[in-house]
Amino acid sequence: MVSQPVSAWSLVLFICCTLLTATVPALGGAGGVHYYDEFNPALKPWAPAQERNIEEVFKRYEYYGIVYSDDGAQLAVTHYLKGVVTDVSHWQRQPDGALLQEQAPNTATATVPSNLYLRLCASCHGADRLGGAGPALLPSNLGRLRKADAASVIKDGRPATQMPPFGKQLDETDVQQLVELIYSSPDADLTWDSGAINASRILLDNSHALPDKPVFTADPLNLFMVVEAGDHHVTVLDGDRLEPVHRFASRYALHGGIKYSPDGRYAYLASRDGWISKFDLYNLKVVAEVRAGINTRNVAVSGDGKTLLVGNYLPNTLVLLDAAELGLIKIIPVVDAEGTTSRVSAVYQAEPRGSFVAALKDVPEVWEIRYNAEGYPVRKIRLQQVLDDFFFDQDYRLLIGADRVQHSGQVVDLDSGTRIAELPLDGMPHLGSGITWEYRGQAVMATPNLKDSKVTVIDMQDWKVIREIPTLGPGFFMRSHENTPYAWTDVFFGPNKDAMHVFDKKTLEMVKTLRPEPGKTSAHVEFTRDGRYVLVSIWETEGALLVYDAATLEEIKRIPMNKPSGKYNVYNKIHRSAGTSH
């Protein structure tokens, strides 16, 4: 824990940040609130990540209480003292730049991991094992994973994630040391209660006085927000001119699925380390932030725009927030009737039902939370198996979930709370990235597969497989639009990761395979509001957004970006387009 007096640390950190901001004008967050975890390493004389020695990094920065993460893409805000890594991301520089304030000290700590862990694991899972781009690696999160299976994941990677294999870099002793480390208990209870949540909240003082019309000339409903994972920024993109409107520093390791208010004015961003940020798209400012958990999956916005639901891996909670100022409404512990706690896989808005839906990772239940009912009652639907990675029909009456153990899909009627069908889906279907359209007069859904080289098309009346379309490798994302005859799917994994397939929704035949940037990962398609243009990410640190004509399939423009991942069009998102995820 921090052993220095607060005033001393305040002085040290203030001097450091004053010097840095004096030399680096771009330092700091939007709206005048400066965050110590938003430095841009590209602006510093710092060796490439592969040339760094983690011990030297610790020695160099421990005096200032600052430690770089191993991959160099993020300034990890930690205080390194006496063998303990303590999160101090609560240290904030106030809008006037004159004060430091301890907003919400995090008592959650974990034993400092080995140098091996720091070198290979910390950049995704956090130096303190509390999670980042990857999940927390703690006994409470690993209860369903045997140590032998954990060793296999370390050696072989995991196809449903971006977890790479380390088998060629590690011997058996190294692997076992890492396994024992991640199953070791933290030094203190990992809690994030109402006091911590309330104390973390940050508001822009004049947010209520901001104008209620855009400060730019673009169509506000044809904007995109593009998460640039390479340097933790977000770009606001004009979908008509296909040019950036604004770029700002974000919290660390944002979840790519940005959510919007029903009118499209506000965007809500969730970081993997629990921060929820409210961004005013009209005024291009962060207007509120709160830390709702330690390791967060995602956020959902109610259909009336008044309430947010945050799903956490750590602690095992659902957190309801007031959308206006991100004030805490309620913490819902995730525990079943037998007392078994569970991580939250994801939360979803089900606007036609006036509810949120939560997918649970560790218990065979799906929870529905009524946001338009007093007290936010929770309905717990018991399932036969744990289901993950949800897809919904357009009416949100039917839920389709993946059973990762049985390698199948289940269709659950949310009205009756019963299973009505089982889908023969082998491999690892990525239902959460599925899309729907009308095929020969009836609704069908299509899903990519994270393990097998195919796209599966399913009849949504009898739930039979209509067609399996071969691809050049496992895929992650699918997209389409009401105004296009085509569906697009990537090949995210394997040697053909640079391929992008386009197939005809009427014939279910492959039309074209694009290679946007040979040798580099192409992924995550999104359409403009009218479906005229298609945006494709080159998912690399020196990447780009590639703009295609949706009719001719010809490239028309490239916009350089730093590992662009999730990108969502405001109009398509708030109108629940059948061609995009909700």
PLM regions: where:
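A short beta-strand motif characteristic of beta-propeller blades
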Residues: 243-248, 285-290, 327-338, 375-382, ...
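Extracytoplasmic electron-transfer domains, predominantly the class I c-type cytochrome c fold
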Residues: 123, 128-133, 137-187
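Asp-box/WD-like beta-propeller blade repeats and closely related beta-sheet repeat scaffolds
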Residues: 295-307, 311-364, 375-378
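Residue-level detector of Asp-centered blade-edge/turn motifs that repeat once per structural unit
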Residues: 70-71, 219-220, 262-263, 303-304, ...
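Short loop/turn segments that connect beta-strands within beta-propeller blades
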Residues: 94, 239-241, 281-284, 323-326, ...
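Flexible coil segments in periplasmic/lumen-exposed cytochrome c-class electron-transfer proteins
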Residues: 104-111, 118-120, 164-230
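Repeated scaffold domains used in trafficking and secretory/extracellular systems
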Residues: 63-64, 212-213, 254-259, 296-301, ...
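Loop/turn-rich, solvent-exposed surfaces of beta-rich toroidal or solenoidal domains
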Residues: 474-543
